[in-house]
Amino acid sequence: MVHEYDKTLKVCLVRSLIGVPSRHRLSVRALGLSKVSDMRKVNDTPQVRGLINKVHYLVRIQD
């Protein structure tokens, strides 16, 4: 049985963190990203979706 949370998303950092508010930097770090073009697979949960929504202008999402 596949749960909604078993899905994963690929998140890629596409913009630099220079000049970005500190809260947004922390959100990017919570996603496991640190350098431009870093890519991580993260679980598709409401918490992760909230982090991505907060920094949507810094990241690119692939299914």
Swiss-Prot record:
Keyword Phosphoprotein: no
InterPro entries xref list: Ribo_uL30_ferredoxin-like_sf (IPR036919), Ribosomal_uL30_bac-type (IPR005996), Ribosomal_uL30_ferredoxin-like (IPR016082)
Ribonucleoprotein in keyword set: yes
CDD domains: Ribosomal_L30
Biological process annotations from GO: translation
GO terms, molecular function: structural constituent of ribosome
Pfam families: Ribosomal_L30
Alphabetized UniProt keyword annotations: Ribonucleoprotein, Ribosomal protein
Record-level GO cellular component terms: cytosolic large ribosomal subunit
Quaternary structure and interacting proteins, as annotated: Part of the 50S ribosomal subunit.
HAMAP family: Ribosomal_uL30_B
Stated family: Belongs to the universal ribosomal protein uL30 family.
Protein name: Large ribosomal subunit protein uL30
Originating organism: Xylella fastidiosa (strain Temecula1 / ATCC 700964)
Encoding gene (name): rpmD
